[in-house]
Amino acid sequence: MSSDRPVALVTGANKGIGFAIVRDLCRKFLGDVVLTARDESRGHEAVKQLQTEGLSPRFHQLDIDNPQSIRALRDFLLQEYGGLNVLVNNAGIAFKVVDPTPFHIQAEVTMKTNFFGTQDVCKELLPIIKPQGRVVNVSSSVSLRALKSCSPELQQKFRSETITEEELVGLMNKFIEDAKKGVHAKEGWPNSAYGVTKIGVTVLSRIYARKLNEERREDKILLNACCPGWVRTDMAGPKATKSPEEGAETPVYLALLPPGAEGPHGQFVQDKKVEPW
């Protein structure tokens, strides 16, 4: 029996920015907050830690690389809540700069999670987002830098207002293939696998926002990509300038855009401001 209680869900939330987003939503969101993580024991540990702070998130396992895991989460949300009000796609990976793993493997592995995993979550969960829902895809300003390092031809494609999801998938796969052949630079790609995957996330967000306008305009769902900033996490390291709490500010702002807000929608947002793409 599903309840009418609102529910927010954050992926990749057992540590870092995701964990800080859950903490902030527990304090500000009027409803249940579901913390998800790939590793059950780490997820439960994270929930316990928040419980010691007097907060009460729920936990559900989610590996965004595993379609079965995504579907199990969707079924849980439908059964318990009849859908989803707020989705924050935060799960992602990056190789360290000094990592010796060959570039083409880094490209494939990073793309699998950051782009295709996020796309798979959206495919399953966007259809169950309730009216006035909010969707936040955590991207990165690295995507803007990577975009500016692309060939003019690629930049034009990624900035297009009419690019389709299929065309974007084709480009992401081409990057992996070009990296395997060692011709990615010659083909106009930047030298950052992480950056290209986050171009994918930002452009995917623009495509999905457009689709929502076409198919569900009256539902007033707002979907955006954002950059949390350079945040001290396992991923970015200790020299980064922002705390995870500061990194959570923009994603939480977008997750809690008030009912009736007209925007932002389909934008790339940094420090609560829309950045030109």
Swiss-Prot record:
GO annotations of cellular component type: cytoplasm; microvillus
Chief location bin: cytoplasm
KW RNA-binding (keyword) present: no
Keyword set includes Cytoplasm: yes
Ranges where the record places region Disordered: 258-277
Residues where NADP(+) binds: 10-34, 63-64, 90, 194-198, 231-233
Active-site residues annotated for this sequence: Y194
GO molecular function annotation: 15-hydroxyprostaglandin dehydrogenase (NADP+) activity; 15-hydroxyprostaglandin-D dehydrogenase (NADP+) activity; carbonyl reductase (NADPH) activity; oxidoreductase activity, acting on NAD(P)H, quinone or similar compound as acceptor; oxidoreductase activity, acting on the CH-OH group of donors, NAD or NADP as acceptor; prostaglandin E2 9-reductase activity; S-nitrosoglutathione reductase (NADPH) activity
Quaternary structure, from the entry: Monomer.
Record protein name field: Carbonyl reductase [NADPH] 1
Gene name of this polypeptide: Cbr1
